[in-house]
Amino acid sequence: MAFTEIANLISSKNFKAILDYCQRQEIESKNIDLIKSYYGVYLLSYLINNDLINAKHLWKRIPNDFKQSNQQLKNIYTIIKSISQTNPTITYTSLSINIGDDYTPFITTLKENFQQRTFELISNAYSSITVNDCSSYLGISPEDTIKFTTSKCWEHDKASNTLKPVPIQKQSSELPTGNQQIRSLTSYVLFLEKST
């Protein structure tokens, strides 16, 4: 594994701690090569933590010559752009690009998180959705979509091949901050606008 300093955090899937580590390195480290080696991890950690805005800001801070010469960073930026476009099909396609074995835990977790967030948005935004539309939003086959959604208590109407979502009640022990509320509302509105 290339990221020896954070290997334990990666194996425990503690992506918040990985993000904190990368932020500290960017601020405190004098070793520019170390910082450059972590840019991909840093960008993906922002995305895993659902912080697209800071991922975009980090992209702007990365030196242009390094961005242009590093194919892995270019591929990660493709993921950032696809998430920004709020088109799940494009996002799943960009997540299937092989960035390298060292990034596999990040890509796997990001895909799972993206799929879960999309599922929650569908659950709360739709009263009915076709299996094919839901399948493209979740990035899985229609058969797997039916299995997955019915396991979450959705109803499947075989005659019309539609699904009836069950709204998800978020259980939060703390109140969201203003930024979290704005981000959540923005995601919801963008998702609804994209689907019309």
Curated annotation (Swiss-Prot):
Residues 10-177 form the PCI domain. GO terms for biological process: COP9 signalosome assembly; protein deneddylation. Keywords: Cytoplasm, Nucleus, Signalosome. It is found in: Cytoplasm; Nucleus. InterPro entries: COP9_CSN8, CSN8_PSD8_EIF3K, PCI_dom. The keyword Nucleus applies. The keyword Nucleus applies. It comes from the Eukaryota. Its main location: cytoplasm. PROSITE patterns: PCI. Pfam families: CSN8_PSD8_EIF3K. Component of the CSN complex. The holocomplex is comprised of 8 subunits csn1-8. In the complex, it probably interacts directly with csn5 and csn8. Component of the COP9 signalosome complex (CSN), a complex involved in various cellular and developmental processes. The CSN complex is an essential regulator of the ubiquitin (Ubl) conjugation pathway by mediating the deneddylation of the cullin subunits of E3 ligase complexes, leading to modify the Ubl ligase activity. Belongs to the CSN8 family. This is COP9 signalosome complex subunit 8.
